[in-house]
């Protein structure tokens, strides 16, 4: 599919306009970043792999009643999507202690949480995407109390759907990041992507704490075999039928 006018370039995707103002085209990139883009690199075929994974997972979520911005996948590394105004909050759902949760609380890596934890981060690269309390979200007027609760409930629904789906893939969903956006007619949609870039995924067949990692932590922590891990996730995800859990 030919691309239209360049709109903007992010860390993982280039976004183009199309003939329809309500539809955008995302070109997924092989670029990899970590630590707020302080670390940069390239992962072989990451664009195609992440686009394929995100496409399949959006279809799974749509089948389960979650409205997303996904339209179709015209090429292996391209996704057509509905244009949205992104809510400036990153919604992180955690099922197992890892990453910044361990650093900030002293919880040991791998400790299962008694219930999913939903965190909200300010989507602002200049500030380092800080963790926000509910009161700070309202102080900054980033959303309303009603929409914040809607985001939380949607995130928890998506979490349960994805936990079940990844279980069928032999993968544990440790935690993941979501972004949402509003359409021109004020419909709230799941946006951005769901992929090894945005999720922590552990291989159920591996007990070794290094070998089990199937996500961007392999890049962050210089564990090697990043492209191989991403490809394994894609193979397992695409092998699963799209169904209503």
From Swiss-Prot:
Q: Which GO terms describe its molecular function?
A: ATP binding; phosphoribosylaminoimidazolesuccinocarboxamide synthase activity
Q: Which family does it belong to?
A: Belongs to the SAICAR synthetase family.
Biological process, per Gene Ontology = 'de novo' IMP biosynthetic process; cobalamin biosynthetic process
Question: HAMAP family, from UniProt?
Answer: SAICAR_synth
**A Pfam cross-reference name:** SAICAR_synt
Q: In which pathway does it act?
A: Purine metabolism; IMP biosynthesis via de novo pathway; 5-amino-1-(5-phospho-D-ribosyl)imidazole-4-carboxamide from 5-amino-1-(5-phospho-D-ribosyl)imidazole-4-carboxylate: step 1/2
Query: Record's PROSITE patterns?
Result: SAICAR_SYNTHETASE_1 (PS01057), SAICAR_SYNTHETASE_2 (PS01058)
UniProt entry tagged with the keyword ATP-binding: yes
Q: What is this protein called?
A: Phosphoribosylaminoimidazole-succinocarboxamide synthase
């Amino acid at each position: 599919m030919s691309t239209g006018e360049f709109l903007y370039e992010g860390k993982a995707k280039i976004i183009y306009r199309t003939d329809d103002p309500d539809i955008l085209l995302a070109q997924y990139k092989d670029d990899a970043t970590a630590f707020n883009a302080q670390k940069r690199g390239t992962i072989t075929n990451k664009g195609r792999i992440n686009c394929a994974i995100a496409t399949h997972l959006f279809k799974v979520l749509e089948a389960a009643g979650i409205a997303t911005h996904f339209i179709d996948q015209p090429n292996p590394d391209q996704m057509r999507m509905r244009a949205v105004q992104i809510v400036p909050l990153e919604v992180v759902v955690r099922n197992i202690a890892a990453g910044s949760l361990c650093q900030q609380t002293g919880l040991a890596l791998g400790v299962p949480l008694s219930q999913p934890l939903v965190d909200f981060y300010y989507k602002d690269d200049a500030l380092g995407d800080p963790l926000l309390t509910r009161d700070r979200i309202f102080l900054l007027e980033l959303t309303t109390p009603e929409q914040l609760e809607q985001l939380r409930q949607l995130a928890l629904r998506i979490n349960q759907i994805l936990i079940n789906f990844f279980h069928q893939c032999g993968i544990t969903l440790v935690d993941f990041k979501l972004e949402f956006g509003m359409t021109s007619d004020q419909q709230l949609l799941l946006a951005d992507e769901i992929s090894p870039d945005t999720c922590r995924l552990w291989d159920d067949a591996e007990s070794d704490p290094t070998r089990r990692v199937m996500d961007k932590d392999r890049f962050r922590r210089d564990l090697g075999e990043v492209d191989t891990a991403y490809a394994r996730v894609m193979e397992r995800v695409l092998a699963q039928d799209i169904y209503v859990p």
